[in-house]
Curated annotation (Swiss-Prot):
Domain of life: Bacteria
GO cellular component: membrane
Protein name: UDP-3-O-acylglucosamine N-acyltransferase
One family name in Pfam for this protein: Hexapep
Source organism (scientific name): Paraburkholderia phytofirmans (strain DSM 17436 / LMG 22146 / PsJN) (Burkholderia phytofirmans)
Stored InterPro entries: Hexapep (IPR001451), Hexapep_transf_CS (IPR018357), LpxD (IPR007691), Trimer_LpxA-like_sf (IPR011004), UDP_GlcNAc_AcTrfase_non-rep (IPR020573)
SUPFAM superfamilies, alphabetized: Trimeric LpxA-like enzymes (SSF51161)
Enzyme Commission code: 2.3.1.191
Catalytic-site annotation from UniProt: H252 (proton acceptor)
Family note: Belongs to the transferase hexapeptide repeat family. LpxD subfamily.
Subunit structure: Homotrimer.
Keywords: Acyltransferase, Lipid A biosynthesis, Lipid biosynthesis, Lipid metabolism, Repeat, Transferase
Annotated region described as Disordered, given as residue ranges: 348-370
Function: Catalyzes the N-acylation of UDP-3-O-acylglucosamine using 3-hydroxyacyl-ACP as the acyl donor. Is involved in the biosynthesis of lipid A, a phosphorylated glycolipid that anchors the lipopolysaccharide to the outer membrane of the cell.
Length: 370
C-alpha cells in the first residue's frame, strides 16, 4: 500500500515541501532509495546524499533543508526530528504489510482449564499456559512459549518463539519479548554455610528461595535471549518504555527506571536501581546494591562498582589501540609503583636543591631534637 506525502503529513504532522501527491510505499536509505520510497536524513554528514538520492521524498529538518544547494524536482517532509518520524512511519508500513494471524488457540497448545484466554488472543503451536494465567486482549504467543501459573500478560503484548515467563510474573500492555528470553527465573541467591579454612573447609551453599516475581510495565521491549531474574522477596521491576537489547542479564530485586535503554551483553547484578532515562552501553557490568541516578550514561564495556548519584556520562573502559602500544602501556602499568617512588624521590631532591634541607632533615643530621 502506498501513501501520498499529504496522507503521511495528515497522520504524523510535518510540512510537505514539493509535490504532496507523490506516493511512497516503503522506506530505504538515502543512497539506495527509489522513486516510490521515503528516505530520511538524521545526520548532517550525509547531507550530500540528499543532493543525489533517487528517493521519492526525504524526511529532513528545517536547518538541513536550508543548507541544500538545490531543491529542484525534490520532495521533502520537514519535521524537527526526522529519525523519530521515520520510526513512526516505518511502524505503520510494517503493520500494514504484516500478515494478520487469526485469533484462536492452536490445536497443539496446552492450556490449563483455569487459565483465562481473551477471545482475540493468538496462541501458537505448542504453547503452554499454566493454571491461573491470564492472557489479555490481542496478545500473541508464538510457538513454544511457556506462561507459568498465575502469570498475567497484558493486552497487545507479543511474545516471540521460545519465550518463557515463569510463574507469578506480570507483563503490562504492549510488551514485546523476543525469542529465547526468560522472565522470572530464580535469582542468584545462595547463603554460605561453611566451617573451617582451606582443605579443612566443610559445608555447602544453601539455596535461598526466590519468592518474588517480575513486574514489567507497559511498552517495554526485551531482546532475544535476555534474562530477568525474579526477586528474592519483592518483585524485580522494569518500568514503562524501557528498551532492553539482546543477551542482557538483570539480577534479582533490580529496578530499571522508565525510558532507560540497555544495550547488548550488559550485566546488572542483584538489588541495583537504575534511574529514569539512563543509557547503559554494550557489555557494561554493574555491581550489585548500587544506585544510578536519572539521566546517567555509562559507555560500553565500563564497570560500575559504586553508586553514580549525579546525571552525566561515565566511562571506565580502555579504548582499543595498536597491539604494540597496548603492550608498552601494560608494561608501564606493572611498574607504576616504582615510577611513582622515583618521581617522589626526584621531586624531593629538586626541592632540597632549591630550598635547602627540610627542617626535619637538618635536625636529624645534627642530632638535635625538633
Amino acid at each position: 500500500m502506498a501513501f501520498t506525502l499529504e496522507d503521511i503529513v495528515q497522520r504524523f504532522g510535518g510540512e510537505v515541501v514539493g509535490d504532496g501527491s507523490q506516493r511512497v510505499g516503503s522506506l530505504a536509505p538515502l543512497d539506495q532509495a527509489g522513486p516510490d520510497q521515503l528516505a530520511f536524513l538524521a545526520n548532517p554528514k550525509y547531507l550530500a546524499q540528499v543532493e543525489t538520492t533517487r528517493a521519492g521524498a526525504v524526511l529532513i529538518n528545517a536547518d538541513d533543508l536550508a543548507k541544500l544547494a538545490s531543491r529542484e524536482n525534490r520532495n521533502f517532509i520537514v519535521t524537527p526530528n526526522p529519525y523519530a518520524y521515520f520510526a513512526r512511519v516505518a511502524q505503520t508500513f510494517i503493520d500494514l504489510a504484516a500478515p494478520k494471524a487469526a485469533p484462536g488457540v492452536h490445536p497443539s497448545a496446552t492450556i490449563d482449564p483455569s487459565a483465562q484466554i481473551a477471545a482475540s488472543a493468538v496462541i501458537g503451536p505448542h504453547v503452554t499456559v499454566e493454571a491461573g494465567a491470564v492472557i489479555g486482549d490481542n496478545v500473541r504467543l508464538d510457538a513454544n512459549v511457556v506462561i507459568g501459573r498465575g502469570t498475567r500478560i497484558g493486552a497487545g503484548s507479543h511474545l516471540y518463539p521460545n519465550v518463557a515467563v515463569y510463574h507469578g510474573c506480570k507483563l503490562a500492555e504492549r510488551v514485546i519479548v523476543h525469542a529465547g528470553a526468560v522472565i522470572g527465573s530464580d535469582g542468584f541467591g545462595f547463603a554460605p554455610d561453611f566451617v573451617g579454612e582451606g582443605e579443612a573447609r566443610t559445608g555447602s551453599w544453601v539455596k535461598i528461595p526466590q519468592v518474588g516475581g517480575v513486574s514489567i510495565a507497559a511498552d517495554v521491549e526485551i531482546g532475544a535471549n535476555t534474562t530477568i531474574d525474579r526477586g528474592a522477596m519483592a518483585d524485580t521491576i522494569i518500568e514503562e518504555c524501557v528498551k532492553i537489547d539482546n543477551l542482557v542479564q538483570i539480577g534479582h530485586n533490580c529496578k530499571v527506571g522508565a525510558y532507560t535503554v540497555i544495550a547488548g551483553c550488559a550485566g546488572i547484578a542483584g538489588s541495583t536501581t537504575i534511574g529514569r532515562h539512563c543509557m547503559i552501553g554494550g557489555a557494561v557490568g554493574i555491581a550489585g546494591h548500587v544506585t544510578l541516578a536519572d539521566y546517567v550514561i555509562v559507555t560500553a564495556k565500563s564497570g560500575v562498582s559504586k553508586s553514580l548519584l549525579k546525571p552525566g556520562m561515565y566511562t571506565s573502559a580502555f579504548p582499543a589501540v595498536n597491539h604494540a602500544d597496548w603492550n608498552k602501556s601494560a608494561a608501564l602499568l606493572r611498574n607504576i609503583d616504582k615510577l611513582r617512588d622515583r618521581i617522589k624521590t626526584l621531586e624531593n631532591a629538586a626541592a632540597e636543591k632549591r630550598d635547602g634541607p627540610a627542617p626535619n632533615a637538618a635536625s636529624k643530621a645534627t642530632g638535635d631534637k625538633v
